[in-house]
């Protein structure tokens, strides 16, 4: 049985491959700063996409989507602002979620614009 850290890493790898198959480009994985961590930073055209990857083996407590709380969203938006501050130029950006849920880990749901900064 794999540990939670390995499962998270496996889920991020699965999400990366899935998004690359959708023609997105990986910019960074596991970006960390004092505000938090962003699982994946991708690019689609000119748009920078901050991706939160969630895996849940069961929907018992609301599933993967329910685990992206308002507090988590705030951390992600702060970390995204920190990342963008280090970039030259002004880029459109959005927050997406990749949800891997259920007993079969090959089920992937991609939610574009999963949340905004409000």
Swiss-Prot record:
Disulfide bonds: none annotated. This is UPF0102 protein NE0711. Belongs to the UPF0102 family. Coiled coil: none annotated. It comes from Nitrosomonas europaea (strain ATCC 19718 / CIP 103999 / KCTC 2705 / NBRC 14298). Signal peptide: none annotated. Pfam families: UPF0102 (PF02021). One of its GO terms (molecular function) is nucleic acid binding.
């Amino acid at each position: 049985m794999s540990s939670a850290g390995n499962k998270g890493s496996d889920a991020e790898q699965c999400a990366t491959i899935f998004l690359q198959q959708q023609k997105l480009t990986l910019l960074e994985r596991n970006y960390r700063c004092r505000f938090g961590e962003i699982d994946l930073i991708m690019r689609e055209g000119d748009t920078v996409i901050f991706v939160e990857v969630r895996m849940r083996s069961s929907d018992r407590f609301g599933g993967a989507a329910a685990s992206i709380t308002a507090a988590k969203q705030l951390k992600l938006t702060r970390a995204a602002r920190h990342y963008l501050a280090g970039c030259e130029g002004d880029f459109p950006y959005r927050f997406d979620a990749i949800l891997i849920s259920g007993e079969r880990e090959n089920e992937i749901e991609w939610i574009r614009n999963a949340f905004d900064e409000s």
